[in-house]
A protein has these predicted regions:
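Gram-negative/organellar outer-membrane beta-barrel architecture
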Residues: 1-147, 151, 157
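Transmembrane beta-barrel strand/turn architecture of Gram-negative outer membrane proteins
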Residues: 82-88, 157-167, 173-196
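Short helix/loop capping segments that flank catalytic or ligand/cofactor-binding pockets
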Residues: 150-152, 170-171
Length: 196
């Protein structure tokens, strides 16, 4: 897949995605993405074995690199960052409509600051040249999906409850909880109401 767009802050944005659902005939999924713009550049690669165990537990690996360079963006202060990350994740089907996932990701970020960098960044780093900000993130999620069609649903519910914790072993410590609920109802044959 190939996509392109125009953004007031990022200029011309180009994205390329390669998705192989049956990589080399193994039944495993490989997904590679490249998204480039004037400010943000992201490279990511993921590999998933959907039948890691006989009872349907999946296992996946992810690696990524994310670069941010705001020197050409006059609307915000100048800073550069380079992030590298890698993680492992597992998925467990609980029923036909329920799914549980958990994973561990390490993120390693270097931030370069300048005299006109945002104050929040200068305060966080404690100096005007920059710093490193590393984290080890443990994440888990429960998903319930009763939609009649994943691409063009007419009725059903999609729920997602997720939690993420940065373990107290590196620079960052935080926790995040998130709940999303989307409800679909067919009003007529050609019109579906969605409440999010």
């Amino acid at each position: 897949q190939f996509g392109a767009g125009l953004s007031s802050s990022d200029g011309v944005v180009v994205g390329v995605t390669i998705n192989q659902p049956n990589f080399l005939g193994t039944g495993n999924r490989v997904n590679a993405q490249v998204n480039t713009g004037k400010t943000n550049t992201v490279y990511s690669l993921s590999y998933t074995d959907p039948y890691f165990t006989p009872d349907g537990v999946s296992r996946g690996f992810d690696v990524y690199r994310r670069d941010v360079d705001t020197s050409s963006n006059n609307s915000i202060g100048t800073y550069n960052s380079k992030s590298y990350g890698a993680g492992v994740r597992f998925g467990l089907p609980l029923s036909e409509k329920d799914f549980f996932s958990a994973g561990l990701t390490g993120d390693f970020t270097k931030v370069d600051l300048f005299s006109d960098s945002p104050k929040q960044y200068l305060d966080y780093c404690g100096n005007s040249s920059g710093c490193t900000s590393n984290s080890l993130q443990l994440a888990a999620a429960w998903i319930h999906d009763s939609r009649d069609n994943t691409l063009f649903p007419n009725k059903g519910v999609l729920q997602r409850l997720s939690a993420e914790v940065a373990l107290p072993v590196l620079d960052l410590e935080y926790y995040k909880l998130e709940y999303k609920h989307t409800w679909f109802k067919d009003v007529t044959k050609t019109f579906t109401f969605m409440l999010n």
